[in-house]
Amino acid sequence: MAQLPASMRRKRAAITSIHDKPPTRKQKLANAGGWVLLVIAFVVLAVGIYGLYKVITDATVAKLEVVGSTSSVETQQVMQHVAPIIKANYFTSDLEQIRDKTLEISWVDRVVVSRAWPNGIRVRVMPRHAIARWGTGRLLSDGGDVFSEAEPTIHPELPLLHGPVSQSKMMMRRYNEINQLFHPANLRLKELYLTERMTWFMQFDSGLRIIVDQDQTMNKLQRLSHLAQSDLKPVWSKISAIDLRYRNGLSIQWKNATPPKIVNGQFVVTIDDTSIAGGTKAKP
């Protein structure tokens, strides 16, 4: 069997002797110091985690703060409504649950809930904006939602709408469309009613009353708006009420209960023996 050269055998023996050499005292101390530092780091980490756990679990119940409300009554109502579910602290409070609970309040449109250091929950509410009164004691928002105020207030400046709550959004659209139709005639809705049978009753700020059924409602109103600026313009101020529940016509009720005369196909109303339609004297 072949043997390695003497020089290679001596080199291999030297390498083996180096690896088999026991560690020095300095090396032992260095290794021990590393383990001590590792244990200390672990202890510090454990103490920190435990301390954080105690801070979270022992913190007092979060303090509720309400912003965005327009009155102290609204603020108090939000706090009373939400307070029963505020049982956790700053860290553990369920913000989504608080938001959903706040949205149950009728007059609240939107809600943003956030944490307020050091131990508060901030509830920012955005109240609904009313564009009309709805029935008795309620309001209609610009989003078409029927709601109640925190503190009921009379709003005589707002128009009155009344109908099935399920139709509130549709009624809001109709309200805006009708106002646009009759704007050229300087009319604006004061009251708008919708019955269960979908019949519309409306009264304008001039006192004019109109009734129309669900059959081609907007087409009939559009034709009337055109007549108000053309054929009916001379007598428009003399009309008390108009019934549009006819397929191809309408019924007019006059303020003085006496309809104006028709001369040459035109309405003629006499005021002090002077006609206002055609510029001629009215015939007796």
UniProtKB/Swiss-Prot annotation:
UniProt-listed Gene3D superfamilies: Cell division protein FtsQ/DivIB, membrane protein fhac
Main location: membrane
UniProt record, GO biological process: cell septum assembly; FtsZ-dependent cytokinesis
Periplasmic compartment spans: 53-284
Entry membrane topology: Single-pass type II membrane protein
Localization per record: Cell inner membrane
Domain POTRA: 59-128
UniProt keyword annotations, A-Z: Cell cycle, Cell division, Cell inner membrane, Cell membrane, Membrane, Transmembrane, Transmembrane helix
GO cellular component: cell division site; plasma membrane
Segments crossing the lipid bilayer: 32-52
Cytoplasmic topological domain residue ranges: 1-31
Pfam families, per database record: FtsQ_DivIB_C (PF03799), POTRA_1 (PF08478)
Alphabetical list of InterPro entries matching this protein: Cell_div_FtsQ/DivIB_C, FtsQ, FtsQ_C_sf, POTRA, POTRA_FtsQ_type
Role summary: Essential cell division protein. May link together the upstream cell division proteins, which are predominantly cytoplasmic, with the downstream cell division proteins, which are predominantly periplasmic. May control correct divisome assembly.
Family: Belongs to the FtsQ/DivIB family. FtsQ subfamily.
The protein, known as: Cell division protein FtsQ
Taxonomic source organism: Acinetobacter oleivorans (strain JCM 16667 / KCTC 23045 / DR1)
Gene: ftsQ
